[in-house]
Structure formats: structure tokens, C-alpha cells
Amino acid sequence: SLYPSAMYRLEGYLKGKPKILENLNYEFLKKQDGYFVEIIIEKVNKKYNFPLMSKLTKEGIRDWTNDMENEYMNVDKTTLEEIIKYHKIEFKIVRGYYYNEGRNYTLREVIKKLFDKRIKAKKYNNPIQNIYKLLMNSCYGKCLLKPIDTETKYVSNNDYNTFVSYNYNWIKEGEQLNDNRWKFKLYKSIDDHFNLVHCGVEVLSMSKRIMNEVLCLAEDLDIEMYYTDTDSIHINNSKIKLLADEFKKLNGRDLIGKGMGQFHTDFSSDILKGEILAKRSIFLGKKCYIDELYGSESG
């Protein structure tokens, strides 16, 4: 539940209209509710194996790298705070927008309610828990919705001529499915498309903060991490207690658990018994790997 946890921790979405940033002083920015700015990174004083900074290559690929000196980067409030905290960067603000009209804290209340309902449903193996999960993730995903520039229509043979005569300017392609039905793909106007991309960006950045607190601490403790994805880390089981203890010292809360913002083993099996771990893993690329599992009580 990474994104629901991020929304809960974010507390609320920004209210009001963005204002053009004229005061390029970071001390001014820190006092605002939120901001989205372009910075130029002058110096990176600390590097990580899993860098928190990125840039686009000439091929359009996002490259996560420590080599960011004299590079421009677009950041929101959370991201800038993170790279200052962990990479110890020195930077200048180039331009941007800021918000200073508060936040709508209804988000936190709604997410907590849905999260608790899902926990209760999972306890009784009620499949409605999947609906609660979808609702929570949609509170994030809907904010970043890209323009939908096509729509699909199914038309019977009897209505074919009428449909084509009224819509010929918008038809992208058509396909006859059977003796009595056609499938048309039409161009759709995006003039009235609207999203809340700034809200989605803040949720994504907060989700990365949740991961950064674990990833960066583990690296500072010289704990090896073999692979990390959106909401998971492959790490030696023998090092988890050390990581959890240090995490609690730093943050004043438990790392391990199934509550909001906590981490737990994600392996499950109907065959293996006891604590389920991976004895070996083969990684081929992003989201392409296999784990060989065993159970502490079944081998």
C-alpha cells in the first residue's frame, strides 16, 4: 500500500492557484505549502548506489545518476528536501511556481477510512478488499491521467451509413467484426481534458520518500541491496533487524508491520510453511526476475 501510505503522509492536496516564483531564495520557498521549481545542481557532496537524482538522456531515457553537477532538474518540495538531505547538494533555483493557500486535508481522512476497511475485509477473505485497493490507488492515478484522444464505438450494419455520414471527419479506423457489427475508433477532442498532475507528482514524491528512508539508511549501514522496485527491496534477511532498529532510532516508529507506511515480507505460498524467504534470485532487468523460495518449516 505504498501510494495510499504516501497520500496519508502527504496529509492533503494543495489548494488554490499556483503563483509565479519571483523570490528565488530557498528560505522563502521553505515557508510555502508547496512548490514546483527548476534548479541547477552545482555540487553533489554525497553519492548513493541508488541515486535519487535523474536526468533525461539524448535518447529520452530517464537516467538515475549521481553525476548531476551543472545539470538542471525539476523538483517539487518533497524531492528537493530529499536530495538536500541525502545527497547534500548545493544548488540554485532557476524558476518555478509555488502554492501558499493551504491544503485540503480530506485526503488523509478518506485514505485512512478506505485503508481500515480493506484491512478488515482482508481479515475475512472478502474479495471487496480489491475494490478498496483500487479506490485508494485511483485517488493517485486519476490525478496523472493523460489525455484520452480516441474512443471506440460499436455500430450495427443497419446504422452503418448513418454513423459514417455523421462522424466521417472523426473516424480514425474501422473494422468489420462479423456480419452484423462494426468497430470504429474515433478521434476524440482533448480541449476539455483536465487533470491534477501537481497532486499526483506530490504523491509520487512522497512515496519515494518512504522508500528513501529505508534505501539510504540501508546503504549508510553497508547493508547490501540487490534489487529495488517501486515498493520493494531485495535485502539479506539477517540484516533486517539491524535496519529496523536503526530506523526506529532515527524516525521514532516501527519499520516492520502491515500498517500504513510499514514494510513486510511480500512472499506468500499455499505450499510453503513458516517464514518464506528467497534462497536465490535471478535478475534479468527491471521487473524481470525470479526468486527461488523456501519455507522455514518446509524447506
Where do the language-model regions lie?
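Conserved acidic
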Residues: 1-299
